[in-house]
C-alpha cells in the first residue's frame, strides 16, 4: 500500500525542520505497524522565506520527500488541491495535514488501519482546543456551528486533516469549481467514512497563517460556496419588513381617519437608515454570489507549478 502525506506550506521556515523530523519518524512507524510505504509531498504556496530551499534540500537528502513550488501564492485550498492532483496517480491513499502539525500526526496510523479495513475517507476531528486562545477557540466554534446551520453535513471541528483513498481522490478531481471549500466538497462524495479524534496541539514555531481577516474571508467563502441560506435570509427579511410596513400603513390610516396626527421625525429617520442598511447589505450579499459566478465562468487555472523536486 502506497500513501502520500500532502503538506501545504506558506512561509514555514521556522517550523519545517521539526515537521520533517517528526514525519520522517512517523513514516517508519507506519511501515512497522501497517506495512504501508509512505512518502511526503510538500507544496510551497509561493512562500517568501526559505521554505522552498528547505524542501529542496530535504528532497535531496531523503528519497521519500518530494516538493512542488507554485509560481504564486494561491491560498491554502488551491495549494492542497495542487498536492492532491500531483499524487492522485501515484498512491493508494492520501492524507493532508498542515505544516505546523497542530493536528496530531500520530492518528495517521489509525487512519491507515481504517483504510485497510475498507473505509474510504477518514476525517480527523479535534476533541479539544485547549492550546488555542479564547478568541481563536470562540471564533472557530462559532464558525463550525454556523456552517452546520447552513449545511447539516458539515463535520464539526474538522478542518482539512483527512485521509482519502485513490478512488475518492479521483472522484474529487471531477469537481471543476474554482471557489474551493474542500471540507464541504469532500463530504458530498459519500463513500464509506471513518473518524479519528485527537487533541489539538500548540504551534511549536512560526505564526498562524490564519489571522482574523483570513478567518472571516474563509468563513464567507465557505458559507457562500455551499449554501444559498444568506439569499433566503434576505428574502425572508424583506418579506418581514414588507409586513411591518403594511401594518404601519394600516395604523397610520386608522389614526388619520380618527383625526390624529402622527408625530415622529426621529422614528422616520431611524427607519430610513435601517431600511437603507438592510438594502445595502442585501446588495452586498447578492454581489458576493455574483462575484463567485464571475470567477467560475472565466475558468482560469487554479495554479501554475514553477518547480518540482
Name what the model sees in each region.
Residues 8, 26, 58, 70, ...:
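Amphipathic alpha-helical segments that mediate coupling or scaffolding at interfaces
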Residues 183-309:
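Hydrophobic helical membrane-anchoring modules
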Residues 68-72, 76-86, 105-180, 201-216, ...:
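Acceptor/aglycone-binding surface of glycosyltransferases and processive sugar-polymer synthases
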Residues 1-132:
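Structured catalytic core of nucleotide-sugar glycosyltransferases
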Residues 25, 29, 57, 61, ...:
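Conserved amphipathic alpha-helical interaction elements at protein-protein interfaces in regulatory
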Residues 8, 30, 43, 114, ...:
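Histidine kinase transmitter module recognition
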Amino acid at each position: 500500500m502506497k500513501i502520500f502525506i500532502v503538506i501545504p506550506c506558506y512561509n514555514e521556515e521556522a517550523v519545517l525542520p521539526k515537521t520533517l523530523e517528526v514525519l520522517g519518524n512517523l513514516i517508519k512507524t507506519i511501515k512497522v505497524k501497517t506495512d504501508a510505504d509512505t512518502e511526503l509531498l510538500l507544496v510551497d504556496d509561493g512562500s517568501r522565506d526559505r521554505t522552498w530551499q528547505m524542501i529542496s534540500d530535504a528532497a535531496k537528502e531523503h528519497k521519500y520527500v518530494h516538493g512542488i513550488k507554485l509560481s504564486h501564492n494561491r491560498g491554502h485550498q488551491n495549494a492542497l488541491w495542487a498536492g492532491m492532483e500531483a499524487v492522485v496517480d501515484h498512491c493508494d491513499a492520501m492524507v493532508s495535514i498542515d505544516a505546523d502539525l497542530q493536528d496530531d500526526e500520530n492518528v495517521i496510523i489509525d487512519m491507515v488501519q481504517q483504510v485497510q479495513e475498507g473505509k474510504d475517507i477518514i476525517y480527523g476531528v479535534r476533541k479539544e482546543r485547549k492550546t488555542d486562545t479564547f478568541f481563536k477557540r470562540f471564533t472557530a466554534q462559532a464558525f463550525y456551528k454556523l456552517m452546520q446551520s447552513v449545511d447539516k453535513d458539515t463535520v464539526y471541528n474538522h478542518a482539512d486533516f483527512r485521509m482519502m483513498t485513490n478512488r475518492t481522490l479521483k472522484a474529487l478531481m471531477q469537481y471543476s469549481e474554482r471557489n474551493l471549500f474542500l471540507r464541504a466538497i469532500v463530504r458530498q462524495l459519500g463513500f464509506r467514512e471513518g473518524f479519528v479524534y485527537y487533541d489539538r496541539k500548540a504551534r511549536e514555531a512560526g505564526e498562524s497563517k490564519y489571522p482574523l481577516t483570513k478567518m472571516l474571508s474563509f468563513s464567507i467563502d465557505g458559507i457562500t460556496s455551499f449554501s444559498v441560506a444568506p439569499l433566503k435570509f434576505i428574502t425572508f427579511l424583506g418579506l418581514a419588513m414588507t409586513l411591518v410596513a403594511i401594518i404601519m400603513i394600516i395604523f397610520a390610516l386608522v389614526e388619520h381617519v380618527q383625526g390624529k396626527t402622527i408625530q415622529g421625525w426621529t422614528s422616520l429617520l431611524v427607519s430610513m437608515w435601517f431600511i437603507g442598511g438592510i438594502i445595502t447589505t442585501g446588495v452586498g450579499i447578492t454581489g458576493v454570489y455574483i462575484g463567485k459566478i464571475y470567477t467560475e465562468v472565466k475558468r482560469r487555472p487554479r495554479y501554475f507549478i514553477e518547480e518540482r523536486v
